[in-house]
Amino acid sequence: MPARRLLLLLTLLLPGLGIFGSTSTVTLPETLLFVSTLDGSLHAVSKRTGSIKWTLKEDPVLQVPTHVEEPAFLPDPNDGSLYTLGSKNNEGLTKLPFTIPELVQASPCRSSDGILYMGKKQDIWYVIDLLTGEKQQTLSSAFADSLCPSTSLLYLGRTEYTITMYDTKTRELRWNATYFDYAASLPEDDVDYKMSHFVSNGDGLVVTVDSESGDVLWIQNYASPVVAFYVWQREGLRKVMHINVAVETLRYLTFMSGEVGRITKWKYPFPKETEAKSKLTPTLYVGKYSTSLYASPSMVHEGVAVVPRGSTLPLLEGPQTDGVTIGDKGECVITPSTDVKFDPGLKSKNKLNYLRNYWLLIGHHETPLSASTKMLERFPNNLPKHRENVIPADSEKKSFEEVINLVDQTSENAPTTVSRDVEEKPAHAPARPEAPVDSMLKDMATIILSTFLLIGWVAFIITYPLSMHQQQQLQHQQFQKELEKIQLLQQQQQQLPFHPPGDTAQDGELLDTSGPYSESSGTSSPSTSPRASNHSLCSGSSASKAGSSPSLEQDDGDEETSVVIVGKISFCPKDVLGHGAEGTIVYRGMFDNRDVAVKRILPECFSFADREVQLLRESDEHPNVIRYFCTEKDRQFQYIAIELCAATLQEYVEQKDFAHLGLEPITLLQQTTSGLAHLHSLNIVHRDLKPHNILISMPNAHGKIKAMISDFGLCKKLAVGRHSFSRRSGVPGTEGWIAPEMLSEDCKENPTYTVDIFSAGCVFYYVISEGSHPFGKSLQRQANILLGACSLDCLHPEKHEDVIARELIEKMIAMDPQKRPSAKHVLKHPFFWSLEKQLQFFQDVSDRIEKESLDGPIVKQLERGGRAVVKMDWRENITVPLQTDLRKFRTYKGGSVRDLLRAMRNKKHHYRELPAEVRETLGSLPDDFVCYFTSRFPHLLAHTYRAMELCSHERLFQPYYFHEPPEPQPPVTPDAL
């Protein structure tokens, strides 16, 4: 069970009754009690006096949706347990057999009803000043923030568990929650710990009692429900047990123990004693924090109203508390029942499926049964299993529905409940005698079955000779057709535009190959029919105009190979390069003695093929867009001849032995972006950019390869003056690479070309990380995209190249489409700069700000946040020879970005005058020189580039920044004057 969050710290009252010695002037962690509350506070309080020393405020323990869907999930802030309300069987409240941390550990997993579970676990360390509670440092896998060091430090670990449920049927987010927990060891039976803590549900009232004498040590109210207590040991925090009781019960017991405000003795038995178990009843408390519901186990006495199991709305008023409860001001009050009604207006506003029962009583419910849930098809091996609620490992073939319904063990007198989906049968049930009616029905069924069998045999004997005769006639007709085909090929063999070398094929060879080929005509180009054989061959433009050019097979002398020829296009059906959507097949073929790829398209996709051809004709003038050659048609298919490529980007990245032939990843991404910018300049949105649709060309005459964008089947041509397209025709693209605005119902504006930028950003990370995706594994990607849950962990936060890449990719995959750069902006980014251009940029910036005032906007922007860029003092992070040389001529400020750039410029200008030792440490110009500084200050280039955007319009910086040209204004006519 994962460690629970640290909530409220209990203060100790009544110093005369304290069990500790005198207060020390030095606060040691062993003298503190740590109390964690639902609102995210961690209070450090004195064990003896109960006074709060300090409070650490963090995010709430639970973060759940504000709406309630069906079924509703109620988490337990104490340990992350889950309860459901409003299931299909209307069972009321039920307890699920797993917690949020366990689900995160088991994810990714999928339920039998189509729910995808995605989990995320993130750890963070807080370094706390023990005296003040101030955070000195925050450590995580992504960042590390620090303040001034302190001598007394406390290290607290906190874990964030995030679980997301995505419904594949409705394509909607089902539920998500975040649960926080502090790292602590589990509670133990510690004889040295002499205190018992009683916590009220629904508020922050805590009563701390001496567990041996029964003396009440102190009472404190923390204004938020308490979820955990901790003490400090040498190895860290250790959780301390506490008892959740009803507010009425706690106030009732304290009232019975003495005068208000002067409680001296706890007269009620402790839960450890058997007497207490008979007087306190376990229940489940349903509470409301902020706008969300939660559930927590609670003990109540006989006077507290409890909602019966399976009910959500009481039919009669509950019983009143026998004793008198005490209000905050000391007056006697009757604790009112509390209920909440969900606003029906939210149902139409948010389009949610609300609960069948709109009323849910907030208060104490009878302990619910454990759910026979279909959340998981099977428990993964890494999910902690309990013997009483999991199918044994040797029965994997059984479905999850066969798991017996779980019965809550907290109430000994609770009746055994059978699942509504699965009926339990006794192990040795006596056999039921067979009724006469059942026997008669069986006899009638036997007679009917025998009659049908007899009729079937008679029909078979009569029809078999006739069917054999028809089959022989059909075979004879097929034989005649094959002979006609051979004669046609022999007559027209000299007219074929493509004739492989070798002797003329023999009749028998063609006959042998045509049989099996015609059988596979569903996935290959068909043979010429007798009707098509009467037409003469057409080629070139005439074939396209006629629209019915016949396709012919020609044998090249190999028994297993045949060639299909349609106009100027020819290909071998057995040489398949790949398969596309809607039955499209890509073959290796020939066009005008050139190797090409031939796409064979089905008739139902002809309109899409025509649009693709039109877009290819418009866009193939760019070297990084696939080249189009020709299109042909026959009676059944359409064929498109395009440039033949060597591989896809996926093979380039994932095949370690792939020959890159000098095509570096950054160059490949630059070429891809250049092709995308060309498409966007033609108002073409690709809408399906992914590694499979980015191809690697065949080596040219110089042995070089390049990247090209292909597959224009889902492209959209925007009309002149339009910058967006409608989503009414569906959601194009491949799952896991689709921009969030394409699927989000909250997006009111139509998508634009930025959907391609989002996909390109994912491709960038895929290439740089050598196969990873910024939104996780394939099963989780689209759900994470909708949630904006990305991770760029493969990019090192202190490596210059990775810092530049992160800065660009984060912009490209931004959730807000308007924050994404255009393709031309991306091409101007420093990610694509050579080392020489980086050094030139630093020099130009230094020249520009040399005479700029320190109070000027440019210098202020450059120095804002600059101390982190130069690591507080850049002079201490360079080599000693360079430090010594810099001190000879002028004074530089170690905390100034401006002075660092000035030093780089001066040493570059006077490089040949530098001492040999300094030149050796700086390296050669320009590559080694600029790497010397960027390796020591990895954020320098990104920071300087962002700061100097103020001057991007100046002529000096035009090579480094992109500006959209102003839209042309309509000419002014004399009539308008």
Swiss-Prot record:
Residues 410-419 have a biased composition (Polar residues). The kinase domain is activated by trans-autophosphorylation following homodimerization. Kinase activity is required for activation of the endoribonuclease domain. Endoribonuclease activity is specifically inhibited by hydroxy-aryl-aldehydes (HAA). The modification Phosphoserine is found at S724, S729. Changing S769F: In a glioblastoma multiforme sample; somatic mutation. The record marks Y892 as: Interacts with hydroxy-aryl-aldehyde inhibitors. Changing K599A: Loss of autophosphorylation and of endoribonuclease activity. Inhibition of growth arrest. Residues 513-552 have a biased composition (Low complexity). Autophosphorylated following homodimerization. Autophosphorylation promotes activation of the endoribonuclease domain. In response to ER stress, phosphorylated at Ser-724, Ser-729 and possibly Ser-726; phosphorylation promotes oligomerization and endoribonuclease activity. Dephosphorylated at Ser-724, Ser-729 and possibly Ser-726 by RPAP2 to abort failed ER-stress adaptation and trigger apoptosis. Phosphorylated at Ser-724; in response to the ER stressor tunicamycin. Its EC number is 2.7.11.1, 3.1.26.-. Changing C332S: No effect on dimerization. Weakens dimer. No effect on interaction with P4HB. It is found in: Endoplasmic reticulum membrane. Residues 410-434, 491-559 are annotated as: Disordered. Induction: Induced by the ER stressor tunicamycin. It catalyses: L-seryl-[protein] + ATP = O-phospho-L-seryl-[protein] + ADP + H(+); L-threonyl-[protein] + ATP = O-phospho-L-threonyl-[protein] + ADP + H(+). Residues 1-18 form the signal peptide. Ubiquitously expressed. High levels observed in pancreatic tissue. The chain crosses the membrane at residues 444-464. Residues 571-832 form the Protein kinase domain. Changing R635W: In a gastric adenocarcinoma sample; somatic mutation. Serine/threonine-protein kinase and endoribonuclease that acts as a key sensor for the endoplasmic reticulum unfolded protein response (UPR). In unstressed cells, the endoplasmic reticulum luminal domain is maintained in its inactive monomeric state by binding to the endoplasmic reticulum chaperone HSPA5/BiP. Accumulation of misfolded proteins in the endoplasmic reticulum causes release of HSPA5/BiP, allowing the luminal domain to homodimerize, promoting autophosphorylation of the kinase domain and subsequent activation of the endoribonuclease activity. Monomer. Homodimer; disulfide-linked; homodimerization takes place in response to endoplasmic reticulum stress and promotes activation of the kinase and endoribonuclease activities. Dimer formation is driven by hydrophobic interactions within the N-terminal luminal domains and stabilized by disulfide bridges. Interacts (via the luminal region) with DNAJB9/ERdj4; interaction takes place in unstressed cells and promotes recruitment of HSPA5/BiP. This is Serine/threonine-protein kinase/endoribonuclease IRE1. The lineage of its organism: Eukaryota, Metazoa, Chordata, Craniata, Vertebrata.
